[in-house]
UniProtKB/Swiss-Prot annotation:
One GO BP annotation of this record: L-histidine biosynthetic process
InterPro entries attached to this UniProt entry: Aminoacid_DH-like_N_sf, NAD(P)-bd_dom_sf, THF_DH/CycHdrlase, THF_DH/CycHdrlase_cat_dom, THF_DH/CycHdrlase_CS, THF_DH/CycHdrlase_NAD-bd_dom
EC numbers for this chain: 1.5.1.5, 3.5.4.9
Function text: Catalyzes the oxidation of 5,10-methylenetetrahydrofolate to 5,10-methenyltetrahydrofolate and then the hydrolysis of 5,10-methenyltetrahydrofolate to 10-formyltetrahydrofolate.
Gene Ontology molecular function: methenyltetrahydrofolate cyclohydrolase activity; methylenetetrahydrofolate dehydrogenase (NADP+) activity
Species this protein is from: Cellvibrio japonicus (strain Ueda107)
Family under the similarity heading: Belongs to the tetrahydrofolate dehydrogenase/cyclohydrolase family.
Gene3D superfamilies recorded: Leucine Dehydrogenase, chain A, domain 1 (3.40.50.10860), NAD(P)-binding Rossmann-like Domain (3.40.50.720)
Protein name: Bifunctional protein FolD
Pathway noted in the entry: One-carbon metabolism; tetrahydrofolate interconversion
GO cellular component: cytosol
Residues binding NADP(+), per UniProt: 166-168, 191
Keyword set, alphabetical order: Amino-acid biosynthesis, Histidine biosynthesis, Hydrolase, Methionine biosynthesis, Multifunctional enzyme, NADP, One-carbon metabolism, Oxidoreductase, Purine biosynthesis
Subunit structure: Homodimer.
C-alpha cells in the first residue's frame, strides 16, 4: 500500500484562502491589514528571490508588505537602527531579517534586536526559549510549518520516537523542542553522531534536516515510519533517499511540495496572527 503524501503545497493553498478571509475581515472592521517588513541586506540573488516570494505571498492574501533593502556595506549598527525603527512603528506587525547577512554584520545580535511580538520568523533567542518552555511564542517558520503539516494530516506524535537529523538553530534544534512539547520522545543526531543508521532505524518519525542531498538512506528507515524531509537540493532531491519509501512508509513529505511551501505559509500565518493581536 502506498504511503500517505503530506502535501504541503495543497495545505498552504488552503490556508491562504483562510488567511485571506481573516485579512478581509480585519480590514472591514478596522480599515487596516497586517504589515510584514522584510529586510534584505546585500544583493545575493537567492535571498532576493526568497524575499520576493514572501512579498508575493502577502499580496495573495491581501496583506501589505514593506521591503527594506540595504547595501552590502551596511554595518551592524546601521542594521540595528533600522530594526529599531521597525520595532517602533506601530503599523508594522512582523519583521523578517533575511538570512544570511554580509559577513561584517553580527547576525545573531541583529536577530535578537527584533521585538519578540514582531518575531514572526521565530529567530530570536528569547522566542526560542519561550517556545522551548512551552510558553506562547512564534516558532521558527520551517519547523513550525512541519508541525502544522503533521497536525493537518492527523499524524500521531505523542508517545512516538522522533529522530531529528540536524541541529541548526533555525531548524534542527527548534524542531526537536516542538516535537518534545508535543510529547514525542526525541533523539537529536548530527555530524558526529555514532551509529547513525541504527538510531534512525528506531524512528517512528524521522526528520531530515542535515543539508546534504540524500544523506539519509532509505534502508535505514523502518517500514511504517513517518518521513519528513526538510531539505531541497538541485535535481529536486532532499536530505532523504525517498524513492523506495513511497511504498513502505506510513507517510512522507514529497520534495518539492512538502515542507517548502509550509515555510513561507507559516511566516504569513504568524504575521496575520500578530496583526490580529495589535489592530483594534
Amino acid at each position: 500500500m502506498s504511503a500517505l503524501v503530506l502535501d504541503g503545497k495543497a495545505l498552504a493553498a488552503k490556508t491562504e484562502q483562510e488567511l485571506s478571509q481573516r485579512v478581509t475581515a480585519l480590514k472591514a472592521r478596522n480599515g487596516q491589514t497586517p504589515i510584514l517588513a522584510t529586510i534584505l541586506v546585500g544583493d545575493d540573488p537567492a535571498s532576493a528571490t526568497y524575499v520576493k516570494m514572501k512579498g508575493n505571498a502577502c499580496t495573495r492574501i491581501g496583506m501589505e508588505s514593506i521591503k527594506v533593502e540595504l547595501p552590502s556595506s551596511t554595518t551592524t549598527e546601521e542594521l540595528l537602527a533600522k530594526i529599531q525603527e521597525l520595532n517602533d512603528n506601530p503599523n508594522v506587525h512582523g519583521i523578517l531579517l533575511q538570512h544570511p547577512v554580509p559577513h561584517q554584520i553580527d547576525e545573531r545580535l541583529c536577530f535578537d534586536a527584533i521585538a519578540p511580538e514582531k518575531d514572526v520568523d521565530g529567530v530570536t533567542c528569547l522566542g526560542f526559549g519561550r517556545m522551548a518552555m512551552g510558553e506562547e511564542a512564534y516558532g521558527c517558520a520551517t519547523p513550525k510549518g512541519i508541525m502544522r503539516l503533521l497536525e493537518a494530516y492527523n499524524i500521531e506524535i505523542a508517545g512516538k520516537h522522533a529522530v531529528v537529523v540536524g541541529r541548526s538553530p533555525i531548524l534542527g534544534k527548534p524542531m526537536a523542542m516542538m516535537l518534545l512539547n508535543a510529547n514525542a520522545t526525541v533523539t537529536i543526531c548530527h555530524s558526529r553522531t555514532r551509529n547513525l543508521p541504527d538510531l534512525i532505524k528506531q524512528a517512528d518519525i524521522i526528520v531530515g534536516a542535515v543539508g546534504k542531498p540524500e544523506f539519509i538512506k532509505a534502508e535505514w528507515i523502518k517500514d511504517g515510519a513517518v518521513v519528513v524531509d526538510a531539505g531541497y537540493h538541485p535535481g529536486g532531491v532532499g536530505d532523504i533517499e525517498l524513492g523506495p519509501l513511497v511504498e513502505r512508509a506510513a507517510a512522507y513529505t514529497p520534495v518539492p511540495g512538502g515542507v517548502g511551501p509550509m515555510t513561507i505559509n507559516t511566516l504569513i500565518y504568524q504575521s496575520v496572527d500578530s496583526g490580529e493581536k495589535k489592530i483594534r
